[in-house]
Amino acid sequence: MFYLNSLDLPVLTGIVVWSVGFQTAEDEAVTWREKQKIVYAAQTPPGTKKDTSLLLPSSYCPEYVESSWYQWWEKEGFFRPEQHRLSHRVDQTFALCIPPPNVTGTLHLGHALTVAVEDALVRRRRMQGYRVLWVPGCDHAGIATQTVVERRLLRDGGKRRQDFTRKQFLREVWKWKNETGEEIYHQLRRLGASLDWSRACFTMDPGFSRAVTEAFVRLSDSGLIYRSEALVNWSCALESAISDIEVDSQELSGQTMLSVPGYKDKVEFGTMLTFAYPLEGHDGEVAVSTTRPETMLGDVAVAVHPDDPRYQAVHGKHCRHPFTNRLLPIITDSVVDMELGTGAVKVTPAHDHTDFLLSQRHALPRLTVIGGDGTMTPPCGQWLEPRNAPIMRLEKDYKHGCKQCRICKCLNEMHCNVLYVCGLSSLLSPCLSRSGDIIEPLLKKQWFVSCEEMAKKAIQVNWLRSLFSTNELSKMYLRLPCSDWCISRQLWWGHQIPAYQVEFPNSTCCSGRTDIYVNTHMHVFIGYTIILSVTDPDVLDTWFSSGLFPFAMLGWPEQTTDLQCFYPSSILETGSDLIFFWVARMVMLGTELTGQLPFKQVLLHSLVRDRHGRKMSKSLGNVIDPLDVIHGVSLERLQEKVKEGNLDPRERLVAMEAQRKDFPKGIPQCGTDALRFALCSHKMQGEDISLSISQVLSCRHFCNKMWQTLKFTLGVLGDNTTPVATLGEVHSLDRWICSRLYSTVAECEQAFETYELHVVTSALYSFWVHSLCDVYMEHVKPVLLQQEEEAVVHADTEHHVRARQVATSILYHCVSMSLALLSPFMPFITEELWQRLQPFGPGAAAQTPLCLQPYPCSSQLVRLQPSHLSFPAVTLFSAIFQKLIHYNTVHCLRFSRLM
């Protein structure tokens, strides 16, 4: 006999209690019991349709359900737009690209959220008859991937990148990319992503590389890309330039010790100190305040505010540098804050962005005293000479951060009156968001993209139709980067810049698609017979190539069929953290290079955090592999994964301890469908998503509820089911469940159009569990299970047959339509159950997949609208029932027929 309370919920007399909310994390260890694993043992060749004629297992098992289906879908080409031959097809397209995951490692739950959301949108449109294209891909992730490979080589073989030639090192990176890329694609398949694998795209594939080169050359030819010496953000650990957007500013309220890559001990930051420069040719001195005393070796001036009465007498005079013996002019500029420190500031144009602008206005020289590796350079001078002491340079191998105390000591010895002020109100310390490396402003020749004109052009074409109504988000969308974008990186892994140093009497740089093109072009232009061109060794910023993804993945710059049919994309769905890194750059580059926006809409989702609300980080031990949730994993295996990673010993201990606390018994097997449904059940916009395994486990229980429902349904269905439209007069509760089905379809329809997937999942869960199982099935169960002999005894055979026919027909259609509604979220279990249900349907559908069946829409169910039905007795019950659902607990009364 079918047991509705299949999850062992407490049964009170005459009442079933069902909790709508997810279980708490504390309940997880109590409620989870290891389930018997059931294996699909049929000898089905890969890519062949699964055999659903086998007996339905007694309980739900993800491993059984999820076997074979994906291989069949993929081999049959159900995910390709060429599949657009459905009877219900419409003349519309729906296209989007998956935000290409970095090949730095495997996917985490944040990626799983992206897949769950995008696949739900894609599968629904495909079922609606749209011609759908969803392209998979991976990003080469220059800085991140090179760093990971360098760590691996150092850990495994004790070798640094500098021990390899560029060609040898790139061979190691490609080896890493191939391993990681395959694993990422395996994860995407296990997540059920209905991607068109025949169009998979990697950002360093030959075709994509041609697109990158073409984009660079076109932008260079139009003057939007140029090479110039400028003050850039420099990572001393990477020895590379970094774009402004990759720099985080951490606020320091005073003296702070920070860990910096390349240093064993923490380095002091946030201490303001004051020292005095002696006036040249006059008695007195000018005291300046700074948090960077080591950069005073590159000072070229002292600046004061023109209206500051304290310094009126020294305008135009000079100070003498105590170490380098240079004369420093005292200049006036309104940018100086009279209230900060002494009101006089040292000017170091080569190591401070504000000072760089001062040097432009006042024609000051720029002296670089810190090298690209973070060490002091020879131009610091023989700065102890004024004391007639032995010559002591700032050794080149001595890191600048450790030099502060030495400089301060010497300043005191030279009577420059050093005063420490530890109570600094606030200071913004720039650091690289990826590694925590302190960013050093350095003067370097780099390649830049001029963004101002592109940003204006994008805004003029109403660059996006915002999906959000809040003013904050609307303003955020319009904050396109207007400062010039540094796109050159001093790395080995990435797209080598298609620019060439051309040697002739006066050397110059020019861009070109190939070196042959450059030599030919320059020969014609200049007239020299022998020209030697040397390729620029730098590579492009990863975000430059990623910004081309929406059209480069379709074959641009060639006018391919895909580009003509599927560009621009229907929607871009991505994490809210990528709006400036990726979204803004795609908008500018797409508008400039293709003349139109790369997508019509943008949908942003929040970040996934752990159940404590913490950002997921490998060093915290809370990064979860989606496959570990799908298959289940022991604590021991989780700990092994941490040991196999690149964490340092201290971080490894922290991560392993966190795992022991959060997953004392490991992670139970939840399955793909449960994970996807749990992720889509969260509101995507607004606050970040705090996900716990217990929430996913609750969704696995829902899968079991679906399984048991179908098991019961298959047990009561006859050979053929009567279509609902031909039933004629039906019972009031039958009409009620039909109206609930219509309302659910209408609610899903509306929520899908506004991308509120949490509303869709909530409506589907509520209908299946509360309306269908807890009310309708409990009501019709006596009719469906009553034997014909009993009906004869009660002389009610005709009435019994009629009631049974109505109940089975309505039950079939409710279950079948619910499976179709749930299919975009739970593709595996819905396919398994739907295929088993179809032989009992009207006319027995052909052997087609559920993912290509028409998606239910309210216009097809207009006869089931409440206004078309009359059920006064049930109306009151429905109102009470829905009110109880609102209070998070449903009390389903076991009642006799309502008339």
Annotate the PLM regions.
Residues L238, T324, S435, E503-P505, ...:
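Short Cys/His-rich metal-coordination motifs, predominantly Zn2+-binding knuckles/fingers
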Residues G110-V122, G129, C138-D139, T203, ...:
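Structured ligand/cofactor/substrate-binding pocket environments in proteins
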Residues F2-D91, L133, I689-S690, E749-H758, ...:
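Basic, alpha-helical terminal appendages of large translation-related enzymes
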Residues Q250, G254-E285, S483-S488, H495, ...:
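Flexible, glycine/threonine-enriched loop-and-boundary segments that flank and lead into catalytic domains
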Residues V518-V524, T889:
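Intrinsically disordered, low-complexity terminal segments enriched in Ser/Thr
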Residues I143, V148-R151, R155-K159, E172, ...:
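Long, charged, mostly alpha-helical binding arms that flank functional sites
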Residues F2, G14-D307, I331, T348-R361, ...:
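N-terminal, positively charged nucleic-acid-binding surface of large information/translation enzymes
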